Amino acid sequence: MMRKLAILSVSSFLFVEALFQEYQCYGSSSNTRVLNELNYDNAGTNLYNELEMNYYGKQENWYSLKKNSRSLGENDDGNNEDNEKLRKPKHKKLKQPADGNPDPNANPNVDPNANPNVDPNANPNVDPNANPNANPNANPNANPNANPNANPNANPNANPNANPNANPNANPNANPNANPNANPNANPNANPNANPNVDPNANPNANPNANPNANPNANPNANPNANPNANPNANPNANPNANPNANPNANPNANPNANPNANPNANPNANPNKNNQGNGQGHNMPNDPNRNVDENANANSAVKNNNNEEPSDKHIKEYLNKIQNSLSTEWSPCSVTCGNGIQVRIKPGSANKPKDELDYANDIEKKICKMEKCSSVFNVVNSSIGLIMVLSFLFLN
């Protein structure tokens, strides 16, 4: 056994090495590239060191030359002439004469305290107290006695003949065409729209409480003998969709086994009158989306009949309880994966009934489904052992 394992390991190693030979060239190429990079870095370092040594050598030579020039007494600042040429020339600004040296061309009569900003063409006789902002276009003939407090908003078109004693509280909106002989005791609140043609003989005792909402168009043909007991809420269209099969017990002689495809081998001991065995609290809609639940899982978890016998009423009831949410007018999957099982569906005539009101005997159709015979535990174990042996043989040989 160990010998076979050793041979298998060596052969696997050789096989892998032969299979992946093409990657070896890439590895050597990578090593060569890394080596070249190292050489390049070394070359760059050497070049940098050489340049640095040359720089320091030049500096030492310059310091040595400067030292020798000083010892010989030479002007080591001889290069300053070039620096002077590069400097910008300084421009000499004009200087103002000092206070002790007055300008010989200055006016000897100028007031030393005079305003330097005075207009030279100004009138020398101007009133020093005059308003500097006076209107140059002012009227020279203005009344010197004019009221300085006059109303600037006064009406310039006022009537010069107006009565100076006029009532200040007079109505400015008075009607100029009003009757000057009007009765001063007249009622100021009289209705100007009063009807001048009112009947003087009108009944002063008219009923002030008359119904203003009386219907002037009352129907004179109304039926005074209408039936007081008529049902005002009667619905003539009560249920247009009434289910003619609503009463499952309508026909006492109904044949619950009317299905022409019924299994002639049905259990003769089944109780067809046992009601409400398959009733549940499922959804009411026949096209319930939950009908798409994993029916295969339900089928796999259903009762298995290892003896290949026909299912009993107990098995049928358990299966109906498991698939009550997915019941429809289509046949359900077989209740078992091997052996004999059951398939159920809702009768087409009972499709509109709620699922919790379905009758086990009258609303549910049943039929037997036969699957392959169930394998025993011994067969399963033997199959597993055989598979393991085959795999071991393939990998070890």
UniProtKB/Swiss-Prot annotation:
Record membrane topology: Lipid-anchor; GPI-anchor
Principal localisation: membrane
Q: Does the keyword Acetylation apply?
A: no
Propeptide feature: residues? 375-397
Use of this protein: CSP immunodominant B cell epitopes are primarily located in the central repeats. Antibodies against CSP and particularly against the central repeats can neutralize infection at the pre-liver stage and thus makes CSP an attractive candidate for the development of vaccines.
Give the residue numbers of the GPI-anchor amidated cysteine lipid attachment.
Answer: 374
List the GO terms this entry assigns under cellular component, sorted alphabetically.
cell surface; cytoplasm; plasma membrane; side of membrane
Q: Where in the cell is it found?
A: Cell membrane; Cytoplasm
Gene Ontology MF terms in the entry: heparan sulfate proteoglycan binding; host cell surface binding
Q: Where is this region: Disordered?
A: 69-313
Q: What InterPro entries does the database record attribute to this sequence?
A: Crcmsprzoite, Plasmodium_CSP_Invasion, TSP1_rpt, TSP1_rpt_sf
- From the UniProt entry, list the residue stretches annotated as the region 43 X 4 AA tandem repeats of N-[PVA]-[DN]-P: 101-272
Sequence ranges assigned to domain TSP type-1 in this UniProt record: 322-375
Q: Name one Pfam family in it.
A: TSP_1
Q: Where is this region: Required for the binding to heparan sulfate proteoglycans (HSPGs) on the surface of host hepatocytes?
A: 85-92
Its GO biological process annotations read:
entry into host cell by a symbiont-containing vacuole; symbiont entry into host
List cystine links: 334-369, 338-374
Q: sequence repeat ranges?
A: 101-104, 105-108, 109-112, 113-116, 117-120, 121-124, 125-128, 129-132, 133-136, 137-140, 141-144, 145-148, 149-152, 153-156, 157-160, 161-164, 165-168, 169-172, 173-176, 177-180, 181-184, 185-188, 189-192, 193-196, 197-200, 201-204, 205-208, 209-212, 213-216, 217-220, 221-224, 225-228, 229-232, 233-236, 237-240, 241-244, 245-248, 249-252, 253-256, 257-260, 261-264, 265-268, 269-272
In residue numbers, the region (Region I) covers: 93-97
Function, please? Answer: Essential sporozoite protein. In the mosquito vector, required for sporozoite development in the oocyst, migration through the vector hemolymph and entry into the vector salivary glands. In the vertebrate host, required for sporozoite migration through the host dermis and infection of host hepatocytes. Binds to highly sulfated heparan sulfate proteoglycans (HSPGs) on the surface of host hepatocytes.
Q: What is known of its domains?
A: The N-terminus is involved in the initial binding to heparan sulfate proteoglycans (HSPGs) on the surface of host hepatocytes. The N-terminus masks the TSP type-1 (TSR) domain which maintains the sporozoites in a migratory state, enabling them to complete their journey to the salivary gland in the mosquito vector and then to the host liver. The unmasking of the TSP type-1 (TSR) domain when the sporozoite interacts with the host hepatocyte also protects sporozoites from host antibodies.
Which family is this protein grouped under?
Belongs to the plasmodium circumsporozoite protein family.
Would you tell me the protein name for this molecule?
Circumsporozoite protein
Q: What is the lineage of its organism?
A: Eukaryota, Sar, Alveolata, Apicomplexa, Aconoidasida
Gene symbol of the encoding locus: CSP
